[in-house]
Amino acid sequence: MTSGCASFGRGIAEAYFEKQQAADTRLCEVTGKAFEGIEPHLDNPQGKMKILMVHGVGDHLPGYSTQFLEKLAKSLDLTVRATRNKEIALRDPLDPSKKLGNLRIHRLLNKSRDKELLFYELTWSEITAKQKAILSYDNSGEYSFRRAEVNDLLKKFSNDTGPDPIIYLGDSRENILISFVQSFCWMINGQWDEIPDQQTKACTFDDLSAVERLRSDQFAFISHSLGSRITIDGLQRLARFFSDKHFRPELNRPKELVEALQQKQIPIYMMSNQLPMLQLGRQLPEITGRNVDYCDPEGSHYPDRILSKTSIIAFSDPNDLLSYAIPQGFVEKYLDSRLCAEVTNININVAKIFDAFGLGKLANPLEAHIGYDTDKRVVALIAKGIGNDHTSGMIQKRCSWTETID
């Protein structure tokens, strides 16, 4: 009798979970203008495609992007890679004693070697590690054993991720932004054979050979959570650096480099976008609400822009408690007009939604926050975009697109 009841119960459970996993109907809604993705820029005989990845909250070690990079490489058919990566310990050119994290560079190519991707992975956790150590006692056995197991896991997650946005609002923000600017500097200073390896070194913008690389190479940023704020703030810091000779006046900024940067269109792929939340309590950028003046070729300040266009592709899972879409008007009011930003919002369920035994639908909020970089649809959108002739078949089948026009 007991055995029969157990079998009956097991059968009900198996049928329930099979129903949950039968079909993947998770949300994928794209609202905005078409975007190309990475793929078309690999076919660039004059230069290289270069991507910088910036992580978000939580302690990260070099190599954190490995799984995402492998999926991206597969989607782009880049089956050849350098035997070893290159590593640079980042420093501030005005204060070499500052430890600004690690930059790891990967080189990937296709089988015929005529397409190449240089992937730069920034790890800035070193900057905040000392301050976050204040909470390390709370993860020790002295305190953690008193918690229920699941609550202990949640508390450790909170201790790991919660402090970073708070720390970023303090003095460490300056060093994190210098770390971003240093990473961008290394992106435009040299191809693979010229990149230093296993060195502690600062980068400067005074090498005129970087001007031609900036003109011929293609660039993109990929970020997660707080990394999106860091990327935008880093670009706004570049805008200030190139426009204000009194800001860090000891460093050169050749006008040829500024002019080359003004011709670039750079996309930012933001996973678990947090720009609206991280704008709370902050001062507005130096120049806002003047996109027409700075971005229209007929605008009065068009020669003073920092980029020709910044395409923001913002991924957000509605069940991610720490992610937000970018609402209409946010760009004009809260982003520096000199970036000439435009936004495409992507609402996408990266966490599966379950029927919680009739109590309502449920998605794991932790999975919804950290699952973007392993989701095949996210990778396919970054690799091949939408609204073009090379869009992935999976995206055409599983994502809807509402195009917006000016």
Label each region the model flagged:
Residues 33-39:
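A short loop-to-beta-strand scaffold at the N-terminal edge of the catalytic core in hydrolase folds
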Residues 7-32, 47, 54-62, 110-213:
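Active-site catalytic motif of lipid deacylating hydrolases and related acyltransferases
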Residues 2-4:
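C-terminal motif of bacterial Sec signal peptides marking the signal peptidase cleavage site
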Residues 13, 56-58, 112, 121-128, ...:
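Lipolytic serine-hydrolase domain surface
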Residues 43-145, 234, 238-242:
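Short, surface-exposed "cap/lid" segments of acyl-processing enzymes
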Residues 40-45, 99-108, 112-115, 159, ...:
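Intrinsically disordered, low-complexity acidic Ser/Thr-rich regulatory segments
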Residues 80, 192-196, 390, 394:
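Residue-level signal for secondary-structure boundary elements
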Residues 6-14, 51-74, 174, 178-309, ...:
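Serine-dependent carboxylesterase/thioesterase catalytic core
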